[in-house]
């Protein structure tokens, strides 16, 4: 059988198998940071009040952000079906958190810069994060 020279082999791009970490670490670091940040300063109570949420729900959002970020990282470290499931579970948990942020805070403005009508900015950043989360949900550890 003849070797197909038009298709590059995995050996031609040895870093390709690690490229998924760019998506994982970028997405997970934002989630873990935002989750931890909700416990700092004025904390979960102020976040909950700003979002018109019960404090317990604000607490669960903060824990969800930390947990889903850690799951996406952990899933990438485990090279079997369990790791794939952990990656997908983490990404699945991120989607409703991001949709909540988009629809409750950022909807109506695309650009991320703050304005008088959207002091926390528009939904560009959250939509990008949602697309990365959906990609990891769809691809799992085959990303």
Language model regions located:
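Membrane-interface extramembranous regions
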Residues: 2-143
